[in-house]
């Protein structure tokens, strides 16, 4: 090992103010100078001289306690600094300065152990570097007995708070059982709601806490079970609240007086005269009264509007006949537009056909050259069956709910949009195609060619609708 260590960045006079020795270089103590009593430590003044001492594994209780009890050691003395010293060297360390022991510890060279005297070498080699784990002073379990005792002392007081005595446990009775017991023990066999609460709290201390929760459950049990009947107060018993009693037909719901489990659920079949039962009977009659409008005897269920929704007319025009008032209009339009096939339109086979023009939004009409049986080839082109958004004559469609001007404006806008987006279709449109809001006033002089199937095929064809 080097004999001297050069300190950098300081002059000699600076170090003189820190240390008593005026030397700038600090010499190391040879291992041979260390005898069994470690007497050579009396002359050590530096903090780099203990580098031959080995690890802190060989700490004895005497040396550990000495580090805190010896007043001659300075503030820089640590338990690791005196780890390699046996108890016999405690007196020899009194002359060491505070800075002379700060570097003693685990990083020191273990090679100096062989040159030490018999007593220190034997002590250090015998214990080895693992002695710290065996030393009770350094082991974490050294404080285990006191910690365990403290935890037992603290847990003894907490055990009483978690342990619940048997009288305060929740009783194994349902709320119906509690109400039945309270009513049956009363002399008059009926109690008010507050009296039922009081009886339960007097008998079962568990229900003296969280009163709002279980009292709500008591009220629900009284209201929703037919075995409990509300009895109005008599004039000779003034007070607040009605009485509750057991239904006379409920019988013995609990077998052999055991209230742990009900034998059967009581269901009141007939309407009793009591207030609680009449409320239940009124609720039963409610669904029947709601079913009457949809019953078979209701004429609205058999109206043409109801029948036409599921018929063939929903596929052709998307709307049945609105009512009997529209039938004259249907006949007039049939005679005006379908003169050649009027008799065929009135036949039973085509009796379910809708009106040809029953509203302002009706665009599809049968031309004179086509008879009634000619609707089938153009069914997929004109009327777009299966597309509910464009069945304009549906009675509940948005077109029939709108005014004629708004409806025409909507159709004009759709035709204008399609003419811009789909040029092949817009190029084949006739010149009379209404484009713009000005066509509202000039709607009547539409040419007959605009009503041809090819016109509607170009405007409202399947590819256009699917992409919109």
From Swiss-Prot:
Region (Disordered) location: 269-396
Bias kind Gly residues: ranges: 273-285
Coiled-coil region list: none
GO cellular component: fibrillar center; microvillus; nucleoplasm; nucleus
UniProt keyword Oxidoreductase present: no
Stretches the record annotates as Essential for DNA binding: 251-288
SMART domains, alphabetized: FH
Disruption of the gene: reported phenotype: The prostate shows a severely altered ductal pattern that resembles primitive epithelial cords surrounded by thick stromal layers; no differentiated or mature luminal epithelial cells are found. Dehydration and electrolyte imbalance, development of mild nephrogenic diabetes insipidus. Severe hypoglycemia due to at least in part diminished expression of GCG. Mice deficient for Fox1a and deficient for Foxa2 in the endoderm from 8.5 dpc onwards do not show hepatic bud formation.
Modified-residue entries (Phosphoserine), positions: 303, 327
Biased composition (Low complexity): 318-328, 347-365
Gene3D superfamilies per the UniProt record, alphabetical: Winged helix-like DNA-binding domain superfamily/Winged helix DNA-binding domain
DNA-binding annotation, residue ranges on this chain: 169-260
Xref: SUPFAM superfamilies: Winged helix' DNA-binding domain (SSF46785)
PANTHER family documented for this protein: FORKHEAD BOX PROTEIN, HEPATOCYTE NUCLEAR FACTOR 3-ALPHA
Function: Transcription factor that is involved in embryonic development, establishment of tissue-specific gene expression and regulation of gene expression in differentiated tissues. Is thought to act as a 'pioneer' factor opening the compacted chromatin for other proteins through interactions with nucleosomal core histones and thereby replacing linker histones at target enhancer and/or promoter sites. Binds DNA with the consensus sequence 5'-[AC]A[AT]T[AG]TT[GT][AG][CT]T[CT]-3'.
Protein name as it appears in the record: Hepatocyte nuclear factor 3-alpha
UniProt source species: Mus musculus (Mouse)
Designated gene of the protein: Foxa1
């Amino acid at each position: 090992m080097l004999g001297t260590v050069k300190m950098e960045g300081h002059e000699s006079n600076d170090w003189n103010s820190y240390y008593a020795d005026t030397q700038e270089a600090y010499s190391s103590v040879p291992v041979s100078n260390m005898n069994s009593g470690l007497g050579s430590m009396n002359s050590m003044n530096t903090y780099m001289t203990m580098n031959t001492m080995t690890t802190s594994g060989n700490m004895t209780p005497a040396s550990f306690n000495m580090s805190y009890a010896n007043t001659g050691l300075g503030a820089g003395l640590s338990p690791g600094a005196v780890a390699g010293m046996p108890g016999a060297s405690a007196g020899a360390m009194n002359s060491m300065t505070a800075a002379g022991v700060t570097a003693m510890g685990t990083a020191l060279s273990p090679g100096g152990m062989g040159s030490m005297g018999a007593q220190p070498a034997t002590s250090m080699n015998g214990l080895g570097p693992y002695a710290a784990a065996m030393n009770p002073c350094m082991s974490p379990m050294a404080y285990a007995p006191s910690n365990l005792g403290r935890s037992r002392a603290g847990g003894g007081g907490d055990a009483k708070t978690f342990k619940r005595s048997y009288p305060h446990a929740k009783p194994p009775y349902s709320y119906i059982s509690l109400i039945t017991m309270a009513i049956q023990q009363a002399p008059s066999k009926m109690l008010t709601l507050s009296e039922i609460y009081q009886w339960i709290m007097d008998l079962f201390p568990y229900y003296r806490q969280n009163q709002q929760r279980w009292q709500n459950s008591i009220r629900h049990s009284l209201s929703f079970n037919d075995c409990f009947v509300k009895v109005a107060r008599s004039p000779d018993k003034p007070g607040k609240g009605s009485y509750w009693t057991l239904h006379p037909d409920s019988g013995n719901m609990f077998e052999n007086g055991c209230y742990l489990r009900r034998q059967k659920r009581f269901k009141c079949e007939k309407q009793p005269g009591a207030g609680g039962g009449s409320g239940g009977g009124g609720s039963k009659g409610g669904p029947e009264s709601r079913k009457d409008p949809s019953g078979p005897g209701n004429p609205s269920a058999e109206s043409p509007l109801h029948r036409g929704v599921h018929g063939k007319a929903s596929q052709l025009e998307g709307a049945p006949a609105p009512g009997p008032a529209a039938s004259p209009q249907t006949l007039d339009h049939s005679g005006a537009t379908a003169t050649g096939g009027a008799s065929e339109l009135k036949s039973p086979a085509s009796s379910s056909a809708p009106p040809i023009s029953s509203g302002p939004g009706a665009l599809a009409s049968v031309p004179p050259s086509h008879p009634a049986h000619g609707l089938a080839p153009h069914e997929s082109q004109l009327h777009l069956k299966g597309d509910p958004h464009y069945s304009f004559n549906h009675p509940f469609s948005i077109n029939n709910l709108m005014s004629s001007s708004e409806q025409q404006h909507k159709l004009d806008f759709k035709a204008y949009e399609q003419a811009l987006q789909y040029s092949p279709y817009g190029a084949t449109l006739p010149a009379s195609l209404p484009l713009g809001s000005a066509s509202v006033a000039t709607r009547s002089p539409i040419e007959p060619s605009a009503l041809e199937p090819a016109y509607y095929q170009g405007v409202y064809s399947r590819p256009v609708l699917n992409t919109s």
